[in-house]
Amino acid sequence: MSDSLRIIFAGTPDFAARHLDALLTSGHNVVGVFTQPDRPAGRGKKLMPSPVKVLAEEKGLPVFQPVSLRPQENQHLVADLHADVMVVVAYGLILPKAVLDMPRLGCINVHGSLLPRWRGAAPIQRSLWAGDAETGVTIMQMDVGLDTGDMLYKLACPITAEDTSGSLYNKLAELGPQGLITTLKQLADGTATPEAQNEALVTHAEKLSKEEARIDWSLSAAQLERCIRAFNPWPMSWLEIDGQPVKVWQASVIEDATQSLPGTILAATKQGIQVATGKGILNLLSLQPAGKKAMSAQDLLNSRREWFIPGNRLA
């Protein structure tokens, strides 16, 4: 293609690999790939390459895996590729200003939210957690701040009542490459129009933790149901019964008012396990005891009915 760019790609997980795959079929010239060092994984703690490294090596691309881009000798790895632009997608390393300034057109990032909403580490999960009606991807020019650069292109998608972080991740992994290819075309032909982020509209997507995912029955049923979807597939909402963690995969909201204390089991039937919350009733539909597969409430009651006696309270 006449407006082909020399591109350095930097990314690590599957989400990033999908963007690299799109670049490789776009007609641009990917001159090098940066990804995180191989990490121990699995029971044997065997060193495993990132999905981006696997794809890059399949395609015969040069792969670089520095632990940091702060040392000058590692920055030379970038400079020596003489790229027009560096595309960064879930890379996991900070790019110093010297690196940001190296490519002719700078560095651009694909971020999984409609900036300036949800800057930070967990934008997909936080959009669900907060009950947002939509989310999307933003392609932005990178600067030294955390997701603070000028916006180049946005694509939105609705959040449905059935979406989990897993399903939303897949939606954005389809949208992101579309936005990226469009943005690169605009950069190549000089039609990109950077837009500053409105600082008054900024929200921050804090990292998730396993402790945050513990169900707090004082919250409303609607909030808890959103948390269950937001924390799926990681870290998974959970409750504790008899000292054992039990993951919750699916629940529904019953708007009925209840005078019972939050955490009180109101009913346990094949239709679900109904628990009082700070507002409304949460109906648990699919659960996973430690060491077991996820199962319906009915199947769990068949083996552990003593866990869910109406009138008892869950911690």
Curated annotation (Swiss-Prot):
This is Methionyl-tRNA formyltransferase. The keyword tRNA processing does not apply. One of its GO terms (molecular function) is methionyl-tRNA formyltransferase activity. GO terms for biological process: conversion of methionyl-tRNA to N-formyl-methionyl-tRNA. It comes from Salmonella typhimurium (strain LT2 / SGSC1412 / ATCC 700720). PROSITE patterns: GART. Keywords: Protein biosynthesis, Transferase. NCBIfam families: fmt (TIGR00460). InterPro entries: Fmt (IPR005794), Formyl_trans_C (IPR005793), Formyl_trans_C_sf (IPR037022), Formyl_transf_N (IPR002376), Formyl_transf_N_sf (IPR036477), Formyl_transferase-like_C_sf (IPR011034), GART_AS (IPR001555), Met-tRNA-FMT_C (IPR044135). Composed of an N- and a C-terminal domain. The N-terminal domain carries the tetrahydrofolate (THF)-binding site and the C-terminal domain is presumably involved in positioning the Met-tRNA substrate for the formylation reaction. Its EC number is 2.1.2.9. Residues 210-315 are annotated as: C-terminal domain. It is an enzyme of class 2 (transferase). HAMAP family: Formyl_trans. (6S)-5,6,7,8-tetrahydrofolate binds at S113, L114, L115, P116. The gene is fmt. Attaches a formyl group to the free amino group of methionyl-tRNA(fMet). The formyl group appears to play a dual role in the initiator identity of N-formylmethionyl-tRNA by promoting its recognition by IF2 and preventing the misappropriation of this tRNA by the elongation apparatus. Residues 2-189 are annotated as: N-terminal domain. It catalyses: L-methionyl-tRNA(fMet) + (6R)-10-formyltetrahydrofolate = N-formyl-L-methionyl-tRNA(fMet) + (6S)-5,6,7,8-tetrahydrofolate + H(+). GO terms for cellular component: cytosol. Belongs to the Fmt family. CDD domains: FMT_core_Met-tRNA-FMT_N, Met_tRNA_FMT_C.
